[in-house]
Amino acid sequence: MNVFKVFCLMVLLGWQLPAMAERIKDVSMVEGVRSNQLVGYGLVVGLPGTGEQSRFTEQSFKGMLNSFGITLPASLKPKIKNVAAVAVHAELPPFRKPGQTIDITVSSIGSAGSLRGGTLLQTFLKGVDGNVYAIGQGSLIVGGLGAEGLDGSKVVINTPTVGRIPNGATVERAVKSPFMQNDYITFNLNRPDFTTAKRLEKTINDLVGPNSAQALDAASIRVIAPRDASQRVSYLSTLENLEFTPADTAAKIIVNSRTGTIVIGKNVKLQPAAITHGGLTVTIAEQLNVSQPNAFSDGDTVVTQQSIIDIKQDDSRAFVFNPGVSLDDLVRAINEVGAAPGDLMAILEALKEAGAINGQLVVI
């Protein structure tokens, strides 16, 4: 009895893993099973006067007419306010076959005011290798709206220069997948972790058999798989639905210095530390005074400058962190002193420099 038959028998007998776990498919992806980016250049026509008359749009328009056997004089500059040059891009999902359709996004690359009401003409979508994998065409769905008055006033809602065409491109060429090329498949963890990799390896080995899975590093787990296509699909279908318990995430504090957003992981702990944080406000005002002499005197008008400096210090409070303080205690203590997000970022950075944070402080 081969490995695959034993594997199927064990599944039918009712293999169960602990609840409160994650499926393999939710924390990893199969190596080689990926989407591919496509991009193309095309023209959108039928715009209600919101197109453009740039040089490259004019050239593209003439090239399109030439492809239909219509030749315009070189000196002629057509008025094409209802045409816009656009970039078209799409994601080609794995295993998508010729004849199937994919969604495409159309974006203006010139000075067009809006793509609302326009239609994309036949556009070749190419991959990074230069081959055409899909052809796009169709009427755009544009969520934005723009309007401009004769006096130059303008109102723009959302983004009228970007639109989508659901199922707007037909796949012409399939991307070859390495899914069936080897005697094994490889799961790559979305978040590499040595503990998670070993737990996933053990979960598969406990089900399929010893040495069926091998953790190669913190991200990749190689699993022996049947060569037969039908068996491999069934085998992978069962494997990716197995449940196991991943390792806890690393203790991290994520700080976005631009927006003031702060995310603190549940595993963040603090060493003993005392903190005091007060606000010091310095205000400097400059005032010009004019000294005007009396009439019929020999004095000169003099301008003097007076500086007024005011310093205000807010009351500050000190608080102490005991060993092993958790996220809840940290947030509660920070809120008690009324710290703003900017103050909190300064406090966290100071704690990290003092070695009081058991975890990573990541500033993005």
UniProtKB/Swiss-Prot annotation:
GO terms for biological process: bacterial-type flagellum-dependent cell motility. Coiled coil: none annotated. Keywords: Bacterial flagellum, Periplasm, Signal. GO terms for cellular component: bacterial-type flagellum basal body, distal rod, P ring; outer membrane-bounded periplasmic space. GO terms for molecular function: structural molecule activity. Assembles around the rod to form the L-ring and probably protects the motor/basal body from shearing forces during rotation. The basal body constitutes a major portion of the flagellar organelle and consists of four rings (L,P,S, and M) mounted on a central rod. This is Flagellar P-ring protein. It comes from Pseudoalteromonas translucida (strain TAC 125).
